Amino acid sequence: MITKFFASFIFIFSTFINASPISASLLNSQLKKNYSFFERSLSESEMRIDTSSGKIFFTNEEILIHVLSPFEENYRIYGDTIEIHDVFLDQTQVISIEKLDNFFLSLLIDGVDEDADAYSINVINDSIIQVIDNTRSNIISFSFLKNQLNLIRYKDSLGVEHGIELTPL
């Protein structure tokens, strides 16, 4: 009886020690991986769900996002600029990232900083981290499965809810 208790205790304790809790550093490393993505956007005002899919690639100098459906678009983020290329219309637009003032995009580019003054990082449980700006108007949830980032959820400034499922490439 005592042997079973200690064996169970040791198993539980070793599982607890070997568990790899999610953290800001894990989130940052996962945010710099290449992924295919499937996004669902829910517009409550229009009662419509839109979907898109594509691939995202990170290098030291830039982030490349290739939207493959429903419309083919390419986004190139480098320095303080985002270049948007509509493949179907063969039109390119260049925008300053500062003008966009997009919390999600800022986290994607810069990663998260536990000491940031502009937002807080909350570990909700062993699979979800939330990043909340100080105004509480921007909440981004990052969900993990076996320490792999697999879902990002947020609501944009227009009130559209986004869910982005990620699959590592």
Task: Kindly label every feature range from the protein language model.
Residues 31, 57-62, 77-81, 124-126, ...:
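Short, solvent-exposed coil/turn segments at beta-strand boundaries
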Residues 55-103:
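An acidic-aromatic
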